[in-house]
Amino acid sequence: SSLQEENVRMYFTTSFPILFEYIKNEIEQWVNHSLLIINRYLDDYGKIQQKFFNGTNPGKLNSIVFGLGDKHNQGESVTLLHFEKAGKLIYVPRKRNLHIHFPKICDWLDGTLNIGFKHPECLISENHTWVEFIENTTCINSDQIHRYYERTGVYLTLLYAMDATDFHYENIIASGEFPVLIDLESFFHPFMPFEFNENHIGLSNSVLKSGLLPA
């Protein structure tokens, strides 16, 4: 509220011009990003209702949590929407085709492995994606723990084969006995020898590159 006062704004612009410009840009980006999300939600509401909420009304939008990932394209970021009745929904400001193709690869493998995988439901539009929010839940017995790590081993193989990186704890949801990968943009990062010194070459050509294993 103080920034609404003319003398305060003048003090900021003259004493801290770079800081003032930074704050101004942050506010403008936040407003633009908020309006974009709301407008896209309204445009996609019918599809969202059918895809994620079984055709029911999720209730009013209680809150929006910004900044769940890095900012891109003038402040856009992954965002969490909280609804009055139906829980939560993730907004991704990009088209994520990998969320369609990766489950197909897992289903193909599961035809032989028969262990089952879990993936978030997605509604993909031309320039953004709505993603099911999956809660962290614990395993209830040792059999579930065993199956969790069995599935994790399959994912480790796939991540290695697809040159994936950055699959640390923030990009994996433990949903009971199912590890769920949530940031598939980390796929396809081929090894670039000119980017690393000799100490990094071994790491970059191993399963440790994925970040899935503790090291």
PLM features per residue range, with description:
Residues 133, 137-215:
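Conserved kinase catalytic-core segment
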Residues 1-164, 178-180:
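Conserved ATP-binding subdomain of kinase catalytic cores across diverse folds
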